[in-house]
């Protein structure tokens, strides 16, 4: 089909669609498809009458024909919009009258969308290698349309918008002549001028050719019509594009963008000249572009062949997608000065129109004001009606409609055009993508939306030179750009192929598979709510959903524009497998890819309910020390025991997310179902959003058979076990890999280890990879958790909602290191009997059902067995063994393993009359085989035995454990003991299938082989089993049993034991499964049916089984013993094998084609000896049987017929004693290196009660004695351990059983009668159970501990009380001292105030905190600045306080002078107005501060006065009297001290002597006491002086003092008293602090003894000493040079304030002056 036909079809389809749209909608957007010459009669504008309602005619040119026709049609149509309608010509029909209405509205926008007159332009590159994103560019187009609409409504602009002209994705609005059509915001000229200029232009051809050159050179520039303020010289991002010159950037506020100087002329040549030079020469001026069409293409693609020029030309001008989007917002702000609401709509595209089906169309919808909202709803109805016609793409078309930002009607109609052609592929194009013209036969470049997700997704490094095979390349098969349509042959001549190509080109999951498309479509509904993220304006929103696969388009796509290059990609299945792949052509070695599992995925939404798809992602880093990369396999190789670490880092908007410290709120569409597309296509809401409480990373491993495949049909079934090493003790415990919480955007797992290895690791050819090689890939998934109890302890069942997943490169995991794969098995190192030339074969290991892993054998020739579910085994067989079983032999080592097909080999028991019980075993390839596993055997005279069988199962790590039938008779005892010690085996079921009549003849063995798994899990050390091909050397066994015949005959009881075994097990065949416990349990044997107590007891019962002779039973038992004793060292003899062909044929009919079944029956004949035959001939008399029974009754030791290492007896065992009374009696010491165990499980106990008895009392009542114990017969050696050499007693220490029985009755038992060595007999000997004593001792210890704890608590409490008492005592002392100190300080302050006559209260004595008058000058200086000068003289004061105040005055003076000078110099007229108020304000502030501190001082003094009053009321009642008396006495003394003091002193002494002689009869001490100059202060409480004489003296002295006080008060003046007191008491506070307080501290708290001693000493004082002390104090006080009051005591035992604490007050005993 040629291009004309193509355009014609497109035109017809679009016209029909426009009719439907007009019928269903009131849309303002008209779709015009300019036809070619063959279609000139076709109407261009259809049903434009509906557009009159919205007054907006936007002519969108889609898929326009070649250049010349389009230019003419463009010109004609533009004239029709701006001029009255004329007669329609042949080329273009007349425009309906609604176009005139459009002219009245003065808003005529012609948008050229993806037109063909220009070829596509390659994407420009930024420096980081990332291509420019079409997301913001498309948004720019929408914003520009919106801006133009609003500006047109206001400014009468007619705009011709060229969008995606060069397919670069960057929107451009180009104006005719760059300024003629476009008017500035301030310009309100009519359209006539614009139309006339347009009509007067040199034709549309000249317009286009001249303007397109400029367009080519400025394609990526965001040029906004009507307002060019955005391009103020330089854009915000610098030189945004590769084609923009300086002239364009220098268009500052110029309407004429094409000119270089801002003039309005049509200087297209200058513009293109500079731009082309900048484009071609990296900034230098070059030659202008030619106007010819061919030269346009040549110049356009001149630098395509040299992509490095882009990078070099713009090495500093990286274009940021986000900044471009911001620039567009700036465009909106510049152009829509009066349309702020519409700008808000552009910013919130996802929030304002959630109910509309085309939320991404908000930009254009806003162009048409409120009517566009109605159009949105109608558009969705139109899409539905079209969907009815195209049932194959109903919902997909609707989804396309939702994401068509530019033109809702146009896009939905275009979808319907291609709806039938490509079915579900219609999801991929909302508007058809336009290819270059027909002269370029090259594939189309990726569409604008194919990179729309780069903005919303993190940047990914893309190499420009990546090959199509790269996983990062859109052409890579792994990216699935086209699903089933991965072809890049651009079919310009085929309508369907053209659009189908773009569909497959742009999207990843747009297959013809409805399921895939449904997932994409539903994501479209979710993604369509956020146009900024998806920005799928011209294409379907699937690009937003599949942004991970469409992020990057390397430079290799540039070759798609070449005429020669044609790329064809195929699916991954059709690519031939390369034997050796070039690593650099595939992908990075540790590059984690995006993974899309088959499970449901969810979307995150921000706090504003806008979708966050693409705004975040995460990267994964794996760390491993011993990992290597294989170039041949294109995979990493490591070993299973290797440990590695995986780190996950969130990037983007969730980079700093932490579960416990969430900075923002996000939501997840928890209830949105991606599979129900038919119901959700018309619903654009976000589903039921739930708040995300946390983010978690989860990790699991998948297995793949193809290294290039990352898709798993069911990843749940393809998962591989992985565990994490660690544990509470730091050991290598295998822990479950738990989800990793996101902390600061990070998650981590360390010490990870694979639970199994990959299969088919061996290479078929050394230089070629194994085609069946299995690969492991680690999958990391980011999950959202919406559990409300996330931060609580109830967070047990989190709800994980997967968001994104990453998958690792392929890995090959080997089971062992290469050095460990030797010819000999590791188990040979443990077995001392093994050797390279013989011995036991290596034990096989493996997994799977029905005996998987039971491989191996005896001897040297290796054979292996495997199971249908992955079991395998390696071992060695006997050299001389004749093998009749054709079992698959393979060496399944990890590094040398060939690809094999799963084979099942089954060996079962054959019977003449089988009634099989079938079991189904499923292989990895879902191959099943039905085989009989348990067949009852008929009763025959020859007894046979079918050994217990073990079934192997597969655990989580592909470890082989027994879970199926196998022959225990072919297992050596050492191996079988190892099997029983394996917890994996003991944890599974052991089946016993033994018939009462068939004891040894049949050997039932089931073994399966699987060659797919490697020898990964080395459990062969413990699972040393033999190959079923290996047979027993029966002749050797018969020889050896003849050697033991004599011993066997003496033990005929064994025959009865065998019969008892058969009978007991036959009774238990209905429940043959018993579960054994861990081998670490010392009582494990109790639960084993082979060692059951009932079986042991039945071994020695005298039972005669009818039908079976005694000789037969003996022979059977001998054979059994011989088998078990000789399997370890078999010899080469003839092998007897019987193959039951009938049963073999019966099982072959039931098997699958890949399953083989073989039945083997080994018959062991009995060879009776002569002694046995004689017994048989005699018929076995009853007397013989009775003698045998009597002999076997006292048989000492027996061997377990099933476990050779077990010996037992039913008799009592005595060690160093001949008469044991218990099961084990030991006479002597017991040395135990292990542990002694006793059953103590709660599950076997009942009636459990806590023993609350007084254990301590019981233990305390027990008494320990030293005694001599008499020796007992059979227990004690008569020659040892005696007190003497021949003594019959033994020295011991212990309890007496009788006393113990009274205290602990349950600790004493009766042992029976005991005979002593001295000949006496003790009946009912009492023995003591030491365990009971031990338990009582433990209880007593616990009781003591509880008592000690109580005592400890009591001691702590007492200690706390003692500390409290000490603290309270210290507090009391502190209170007393504080009171006295306050009293002394207050007394001194009161006297100071009186002496100063309250000078402090006067304002002249204004002092800040008592500093003096200098601070007064400082304060007054704020009101009178000259005071600062006066106060500055205090700098010369030697006093520190005054010097500081003087310094402050000086500083204030300097500052004032400087401020005054500056203000006068600069603002002399305002200097006074500023300085004067400032000084006054500062002065008031200083006054307030001074007043505040002064008030504080007054408050403190007031507080002290109040406190002294309280002190007086609380013990200091006479304090004021004492103080006043002291002052009067001191003043009187000072007044008379200077007048003949000695005379008066002598006279007073004489008078006192006379008075004393008269009153006291010879006491000479009254002379000094009666001295008038002596002033004594009365003592209120003279407890320390009990002498009556001294009391009288003190009373007389008090009377004299009172009388003298009255006289002195009348004589003295107040002023003289104040002066004298001030001089004398200036240093009193020092004495109060230094001397009295120290003595008071020493005397406080001393009671009793100190009082009594002080009283005795006081009574011994003589009055002469008292008078002498008073006189000495008086002399010192009268010293004129040292006028001070010395407060001293008359001796060391009488302090100044000797306070004797009383309940009410504190009394001063004496104060001496």
Swiss-Prot record:
Where does the UniProt annotation locate this protein?
Membrane
Regions recorded as binding DNA? 544-825
Tell me where in this chain the Peptidase S74 domain is found. 1240-1355
Basic residues: bias regions: 265-276, 490-504
Gene Ontology MF terms: DNA-binding transcription factor activity; sequence-specific DNA binding
Regions of compositional bias (Polar residues) in chain numbering:
1-12
* Keywords tagged on the record: DNA-binding, Membrane, Transmembrane, Transmembrane helix
The record's annotation in PROSITE patterns points to: ICA, NDT80
Q: Where are the transmembrane segments?
A: 1416-1436, 1447-1467, 1473-1493
Query: What's a single GO BP term from this record?
Result: protein autoprocessing
Q: Where is the composition biased (Low complexity)?
A: 13-35, 79-109, 126-170, 177-200, 226-264, 317-470, 478-489, 505-553, 898-946, 1148-1189, 1596-1605
Under InterPro entries, the record lists: MRF-like, NDT80_DNA-bd_dom, p53-like_TF_DNA-bd_sf, S74_ICA
Q: How does it sit in the membrane?
A: Multi-pass membrane protein
The domain of life for this entry's organism is Eukaryota
According to the UniProt entry, which residue ranges have a biased composition of type Basic and acidic residues?
822-832, 1617-1634
Question: Its GO CC terms?
Answer: endoplasmic reticulum membrane; nucleus
Which positions does the site annotation Cleavage cover? 1239-1240
Q: Where is this region: Disordered?
A: 1-35, 79-200, 226-290, 309-557, 713-734, 808-952, 1143-1190, 1596-1634, 1646-1665
Gly residues composition-biased segments? 838-874
Main location per the UniProt record: membrane
What SUPFAM superfamilies does this protein's entry cite? p53-like transcription factors (SSF49417)
Name the chain's protein: Uncharacterized membrane protein DDB_G0293934
Task: State the species of origin.
Answer: Dictyostelium discoideum
The lineage is:
Eukaryota, Amoebozoa, Evosea, Eumycetozoa, Dictyostelia
């Amino acid at each position: 089909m040629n291009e004309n036909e193509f355009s014609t079809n497109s035109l017809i389809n679009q016209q029909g669609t426009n009719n439907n749209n007009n019928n269903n909608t009131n849309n303002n957007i008209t779709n015009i498809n300019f036809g070619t010459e063959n279609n000139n009669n076709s109407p261009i504008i259809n049903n434009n009458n509906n557009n009159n309602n919205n007054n907006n005619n936007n002519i969108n040119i889609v898929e326009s024909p070649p250049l010349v026709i389009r230019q003419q049609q463009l010109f004609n149509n533009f004239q029709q919009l701006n001029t009255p309608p004329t007669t329609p010509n042949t080329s273009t029909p007349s425009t309906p009258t609604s176009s005139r209405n459009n002219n009245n509205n003065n808003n005529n926008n012609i948008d050229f969308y993806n037109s063909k007159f220009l070829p596509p332009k390659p994407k420009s590159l930024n420096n980081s290698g990332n291509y420019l994103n079409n997301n913001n560019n498309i948004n720019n187009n929408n914003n520009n349309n919106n801006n133009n609409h609003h500006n047109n409504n206001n400014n009468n602009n007619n705009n011709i918008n060229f969008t995606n002209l060069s397919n670069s994705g960057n929107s451009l609005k180009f104006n005719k002549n760059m300024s003629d059509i476009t008017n500035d915001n301030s310009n309100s000229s009519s359209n006539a001028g614009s139309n006339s200029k347009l009509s007067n232009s040199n034709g549309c051809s000249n317009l286009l050719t001249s303007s397109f050159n400029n367009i080519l050179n400025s394609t990526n520039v965001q040029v906004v019509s009507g307002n060019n303020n955005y391009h103020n010289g330089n854009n915000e991002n610098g030189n945004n594009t590769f084609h923009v010159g300086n002239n364009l950037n220098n268009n500052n506020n110029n309407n004429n963008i094409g000119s270089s100087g801002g003039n309005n002329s049509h200087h297209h040549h200058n513009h293109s000249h500079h731009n082309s030079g900048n484009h071609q020469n990296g900034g230098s001026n070059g030659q202008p572009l030619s106007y010819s069409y061919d030269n346009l293409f040549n110049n356009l693609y001149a630098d395509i062949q040299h992509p490095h020029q882009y990078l070099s030309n713009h090495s500093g001008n990286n274009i940021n997608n986000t900044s471009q989007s911001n620039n567009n917002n700036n465009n909106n702000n510049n152009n829509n000065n009066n349309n702020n609401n519409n700008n808000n709509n552009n910013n919130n595209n996802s929030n304002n129109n959630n109910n509309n089906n085309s939320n991404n169309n908000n930009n254009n919808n806003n162009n048409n004001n409120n009517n566009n909202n109605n159009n949105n709803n109608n558009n969705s109805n139109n899409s539905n009606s079209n969907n009815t016609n195209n049932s194959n793409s109903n919902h997909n078309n609707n989804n396309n409609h939702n994401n068509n930002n530019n033109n809702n009607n146009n896009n939905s109609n275009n979808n319907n055009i291609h709806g039938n052609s490509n079915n579900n592929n219609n999801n991929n194009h909302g508007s058809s993508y336009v290819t270059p013209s027909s002269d370029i036969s090259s594939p189309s470049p990726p569409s604008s939306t194919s990179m729309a997700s780069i903005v919303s997704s993190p940047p990914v490094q893309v190499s420009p030179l990546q090959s199509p095979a790269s996983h990062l390349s859109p052409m890579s098969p792994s990216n699935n750009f086209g699903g089933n349509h991965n072809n890049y042959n651009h079919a310009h001549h085929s309508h369907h192929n053209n659009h189908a190509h773009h569909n497959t080109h742009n999207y990843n999951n747009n297959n013809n598979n409805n399921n895939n498309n449904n997932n994409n479509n539903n994501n479209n509904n979710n993604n369509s709510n956020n146009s900024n993220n998806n920005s799928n304006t011209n294409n379907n929103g699937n690009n937003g959903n599949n942004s991970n696969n469409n992020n990057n388009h390397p430079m290799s796509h540039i070759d798609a524009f070449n005429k020669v290059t044609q790329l064809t990609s195929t699916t991954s299945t059709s690519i031939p497998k390369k034997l050796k792949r070039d690593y650099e052509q595939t992908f990075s070695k540790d590059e984690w890819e995006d993974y899309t599992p088959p499970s449901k995925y969810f979307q995150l939404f921000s706090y504003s309910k806008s979708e966050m798809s693409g705004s975040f992602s995460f990267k994964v880093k794996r760390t491993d020390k011993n990992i290597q990369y294989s170039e041949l396999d294109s995979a990493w190789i490591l070993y299973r025991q290797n440990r590695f670490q995986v780190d996950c880092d969130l990037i983007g908007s969730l980079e700093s997310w932490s579960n416990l410290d969430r900075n923002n709120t996000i939501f997840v569409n928890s209830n949105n179902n991606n599979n129900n597309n038919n119901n959700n296509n018309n619903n654009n809401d976000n589903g039921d959003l739930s708040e995300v409480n946390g983010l978690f990373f989860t990790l699991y491993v998948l297995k793949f058979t193809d290294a290039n495949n990352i898709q798993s049909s069911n990843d749940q079934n393809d998962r591989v076990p992985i565990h994490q090493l660690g544990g509470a003790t730091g050991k290598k415990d295998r822990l479950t890999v738990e989800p990793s919480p996101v902390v600061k955007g990070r998650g981590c797992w360390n010490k990870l280890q694979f639970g199994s290895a990959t299969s088919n690791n061996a290479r078929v050819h050394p230089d070629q990879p194994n085609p069946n090689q299995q690969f492991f890939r680690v999958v990391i998934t980011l999950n959202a958790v919406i559990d409300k109890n996330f931060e609580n302890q109830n967070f047990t069942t989190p709800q994980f909602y997967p968001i994104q997943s990453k998958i690792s490169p392929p890995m090959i995991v080997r089971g062992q290191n290469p050095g460990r794969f030797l010819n000999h098995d590791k188990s040979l190192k443990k077995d001392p009997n093994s050797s390279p030339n013989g011995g036991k074969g290596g034990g096989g290991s493996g997994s799977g059902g029905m005996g998987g892993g039971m491989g191996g054998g005896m001897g040297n020739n290796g054979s292996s067995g495997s199971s249908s579910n992955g079991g395998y085994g390696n071992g060695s067989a006997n050299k001389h063994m004749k093998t009749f079983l054709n079992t698959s032999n393979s060496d399944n080592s990890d590094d040398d393993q060939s690809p094999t097909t799963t084979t099942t080999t089954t060996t079962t028991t054959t019977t003449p009359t089988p009634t099989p019980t079938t079991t189904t075993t499923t292989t990895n390839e879902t191959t099943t085989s039905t085989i009989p596993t348990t067949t009852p055997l008929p009763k025959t005279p020859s007894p046979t035995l079918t050994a217990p069988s073990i079934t192997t199962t597969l655990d989580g790590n592909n470890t082989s454990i027994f879970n199926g039938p196998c022959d225990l008779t072919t297992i050596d005892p050492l191996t079988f003991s190892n099997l029983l010690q394996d917890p994996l085996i003991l944890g599974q079921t052991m089946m016993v299938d033994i018939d009462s009549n068939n004891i040894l003849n049949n050997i039932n063995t089931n073994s399966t082989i699987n060659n797919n798994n490697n020898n990964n899990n080395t459990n062969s050390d413990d699972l040393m089993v033999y190959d079923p091909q290996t047979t027993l050397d029966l002749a050797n066994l018969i020889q050896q049993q003849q050697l033991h015949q004599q011993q066997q005959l003496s033990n005929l009881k064994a025959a009865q034991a065998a019969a008892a075994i058969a009978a007991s097990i036959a009774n238990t065949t209905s429940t043959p499964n018993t579960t054994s416990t861990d081998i670490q349990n010392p009582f494990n044997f109790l639960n084993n049916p082979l060692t059951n107590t009932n079986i042991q007891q039945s071994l020695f019962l005298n039972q005669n089984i009818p039908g079976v002779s005694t000789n037969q039973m003996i022979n059977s038992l001998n054979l059994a013993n011989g088998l078990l004793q000789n399997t370890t060292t078999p010899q080469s003899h003839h092998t007897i094998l019987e193959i039951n062909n009938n049963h073999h044929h019966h099982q072959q009919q039931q098997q699958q084609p890949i399953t083989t079944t073989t039945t083997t029956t080994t018959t062991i004949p009995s060879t009776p000896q002569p002694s046995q035959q004689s017994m048989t001939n005699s018929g076995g008399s009853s007397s013989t049987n009775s003698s045998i029974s009597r002999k076997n009754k006292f048989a000492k030791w027996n061997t377990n017929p099933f476990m050779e290492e077990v010996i037992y007896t039913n008799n009592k065992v005595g060690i160093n004693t001949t008469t044991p009374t218990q099961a084990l009696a030991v006479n002597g010491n017991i040395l135990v290196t292990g542990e002694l165990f006793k059953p103590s499980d709660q599950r076997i106990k009942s009636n459990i009660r806590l023993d609350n008895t007084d254990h301590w009392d019981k233990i305390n009542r027990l008494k320990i004695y030293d005694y001599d114990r008499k020796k007992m017969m059979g227990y004690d050696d008569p020659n040892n351990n005696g007190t003497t050499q021949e003594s019959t007693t033994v020295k011991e220490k212990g309890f007496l059983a009788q006393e113990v029985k009274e205290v602990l009755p349950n600790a004493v038992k009766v042992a029976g009668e005991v005979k002593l060595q001295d000949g006496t007999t003790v009946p009912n000997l009492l023995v003591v159970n030491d365990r009971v004593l031990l338990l009582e001792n433990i209880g007593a210890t616990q009781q003591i501990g509880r008592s000690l704890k109580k005592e400890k608590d009591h001691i702590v409490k007492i200690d706390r009380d003692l500390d409290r008492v000490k603290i309270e005592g210290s507090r009391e002392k502190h209170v007393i001292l504080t009171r006295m100190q306050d009293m002394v300080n207050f007394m001194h302050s009161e006297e100071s105030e009186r002496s100063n006559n309250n000078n402090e209260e006067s304002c002249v004595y204004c002092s800040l905190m008592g500093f003096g008058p200098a601070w007064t000058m400082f304060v007054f200086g704020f009101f009178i600045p000259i005071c600062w000068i006066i106060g500055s003289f205090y700098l010369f004061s030697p006093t520190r306080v005054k010097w500081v105040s003087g310094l402050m005055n000086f500083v204030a003076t300097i500052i004032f002078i400087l401020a005054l000078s500056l203000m006068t110099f600069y603002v002399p007229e305002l200097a006074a107005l500023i300085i004067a108020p400032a000084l006054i304000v500062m002065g008031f502030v200083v006054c307030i501060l001074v007043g505040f501190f002064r008030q504080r001082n007054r408050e403190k003094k007031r507080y002290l006065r109040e406190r002294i009053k309280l002190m007086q009321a609380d013990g200091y009642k006479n304090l004021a009297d004492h103080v006043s008396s002291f002052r009067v006495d001191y003043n009187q003394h000072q007044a008379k001290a200077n007048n003949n003091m000695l005379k008066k002193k002598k006279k007073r002494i004489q008078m006192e002597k006379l008075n004393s002689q008269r009153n006291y009869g010879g006491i000479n001490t009254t002379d000094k006491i009666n001295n008038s100059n002596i002033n004594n202060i009365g003592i209120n409480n003279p407890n320390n002086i009990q002498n009556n004489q001294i009391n009288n003296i003190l009373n007389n002295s008090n009377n004299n003092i009172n009388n003298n006080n009255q006289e002195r008060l009348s004589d003295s003046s107040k002023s003289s008293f104040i002066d004298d007191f001030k001089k004398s008491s200036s240093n009193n506070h020092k004495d109060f602090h230094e001397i009295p307080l120290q003595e008071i501290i020493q005397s406080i708290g001393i009671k009793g003894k100190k009082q009594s001693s002080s009283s005795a000493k006081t009574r011994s004082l003589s009055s002469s000493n008292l008078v002498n002390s008073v006189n000495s104090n008086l002399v010192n006080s009268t010293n004129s040079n040292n006028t001070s009051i010395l407060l001293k005591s008359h001796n060391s035992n009488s302090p100044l304030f000797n306070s004797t604490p009383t309940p009410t007050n504190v009394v001063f005993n004496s104060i001496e002056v």
